[in-house]
Amino acid sequence: MTKDLYDKLMVFGNDREPFLAHNFMRTTDLDDGTATVTLPMHTESLNRWGGAHGGILFSLCDVAMGMAIMTLRQEMVVTVNATIDYLSAAAAGSTLTTVGKVDRLGGK
């Protein structure tokens, strides 16, 4: 990936997407086919039991996937289908880190 593309994607992933800012998500690293996105757990991200809300976890993964794809295909992408298995809870005060990795880049 060129430095220009890296810089553009970092701006997009941190400064130009209102949903990410609203939910405290930050793109922290990009490489060809990978993207690292972090989420410091705030009260607004928790469910009524004090764990991370499933929707915010799914969104974190979705953002990492989309950013990883954009390192390889310089166009906007959308998720058509996704599945997630929740293995354990994340608590307030923790920071979650997810790495999206492209295994296979499909066609258009």
Label every model-predicted segment.
Residues 1-108:
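Terminal targeting signals and extreme-terminal segments of soluble enzymes
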